From Swiss-Prot:
SUPFAM superfamilies: Actin-like ATPase domain (SSF53067), HD-domain/PDEase-like (SSF109604)
Keyword Hydrolase: yes
Gene Ontology biological-process annotations: guanosine pentaphosphate catabolic process; guanosine tetraphosphate biosynthetic process; nucleobase-containing small molecule interconversion
Listed InterPro entries: ATPase_NBD, GppA/Ppx_hydrolase, Guo-5TP_3DP_PyrP, Ppx_GppA_C, Ppx_GppA_N, PyroPPase_GppA_Ppx
Reactions catalysed, as given in the entry: guanosine 3'-diphosphate 5'-triphosphate + H2O = guanosine 3',5'-bis(diphosphate) + phosphate + H(+)
EC number(s) recorded for this UniProt protein: 3.6.1.40
Example of a GO MF term: guanosine-5'-triphosphate,3'-diphosphate diphosphatase activity
Protein name per the record: Guanosine-5'-triphosphate,3'-diphosphate pyrophosphatase
Enzyme class: hydrolase
UniProt source species: Pseudoalteromonas atlantica (strain T6c / ATCC BAA-1087)
Role description: Catalyzes the conversion of pppGpp to ppGpp. Guanosine pentaphosphate (pppGpp) is a cytoplasmic signaling molecule which together with ppGpp controls the 'stringent response', an adaptive process that allows bacteria to respond to amino acid starvation, resulting in the coordinated regulation of numerous cellular activities.
Keyword terms, alphabetized: Hydrolase
Similarity-based family: Belongs to the GppA/Ppx family. GppA subfamily.
Pathway assigned in UniProt: Purine metabolism; ppGpp biosynthesis; ppGpp from GTP: step 2/2
Gene name linked to the record: gppA
Amino acid sequence: MITSTRLPQNHPEELYAAVDLGSNSFHLVIVRVVAGSVQIIGKVKQKVRLAAGLDDNMMLDNESLERGWRCLETFAERLQDIPRDNIRVVATATLRLAKNADVFTVKAQQILDHTLSVISGEEEARQIYLGVAYTSANQGNSLVIDIGGASTEIIIGNDMTPIHLVSLNMGCVTFKERHFAGDVLSEENFAAAIDAAKAMVDAVADKFVCFDWQQCLGASGTPQAITEILVAQGISDAIRLDYLYNLRQQCIDCSTLDNLIIDGLDESRRIIFPSGLAILIALFESLSIRDMQISGGALREGLIYGMLENMQQNDRRMQTIHQHMQHFHIDSEQAERVTEVALTLFKQLSEQTDVDGIDGEAMLVAAAMLHETGLHIEYKLHHKHGAYILGHVPMVGYTNLQRDGIKTLVLNHRQQISPEVFDQNHSETRGIMRSLVRVLRLACILSIRRKDNLLPQFCLEVEENDWRLVFPEGWLKAHPLIDAELANEKWQQHKMGWHLTCE
């Protein structure tokens, strides 16, 4: 059975804040820790484009300084009610590079009434990795990439420990000024930007490609913008190099930044999108990245969780699951019952076919534990209500693609199967998602009595789309309710072109 994992409770409620003075945007995040869980209660993001104010002599101009100070004046009021020891304020690449950084930091500290730390590139990379590790799925070795305004961090790590990290002086703002200064989007400009980025990445690539990483995660910024574009264009998938090439061509077809209109591209990112895209293409090519998923956190989340050291010892996925189970009053015994049956089926399935690649077992566990979320609203359409809810609540410990997979499983765990949801999956993952749906549907049917110790030993035999579920002789006849439900399930799967035999 799945056991409960909860965070230790420090105080009834505490507020924490992290301020990240990035080269493109300034960020403020405020969280509260209550009953052992971390809840975001405030986020502020302002485009400051501090790096755009750097001249050839590495001096920040007055306009960029003023933009930064005005932004901090809005942040200062939000920080007044938070204990000083619970606040961290850091600045990154631009203030590392600027020769007159002290002009900015002295006044910034006066405005915030708090110490501002200009952290090194290595420390920034470490904090980014921690933010990603706390909020995203753990699948062994992970390659983490963050493209900022003036620097790009590359980190390889395992679980909560960064193994090797580097910070490169290239970012979407500085590359925009350097390679797209005339706002022209040409093949030549893209080639120059990609070549420049590859020259920097190639110098350190050997230290990363030697690691056998299980997943590549992109932290915010350009990867997030690309994911939003893919979703808007009907693609529910990880970021892949062929998608990046296609987006590069879409940019070139627009000719100039003024004319850059891509379905799904937020206006606030339009100016720096091509330069960030060029850097990401270079990273994919130099590091031989197959695909990239979006992480749930980055630098500011690393700062927050760094102040909550006790969280390092806890399973973030199970914490997420149990928080939602409590909030939506899910029957924990039935959830564990369905999960146990689902895992039994999954184990037999995995012995006969390839279900690796997207951490399907973790998605199956989450969906099985949370499949009755929608009962919080009503019974008839609870599978649809549950899928909607899980698409809009925090799923700490899971990537965005895994959250989408959990939604798909919950949506299809009963009644008719929605074939269109699989069309958005990449061909490599589509078959796995179909198999997981079939497993969860069978687990729900076999647990329909909501009682323990009713099921006998059973065997799942799999040959492509033909599944055979074998019970002891006479068992189905002695259990007409489950027999009838399985008969209906045969028909539902038949409509999908899947063959199910139960005997």
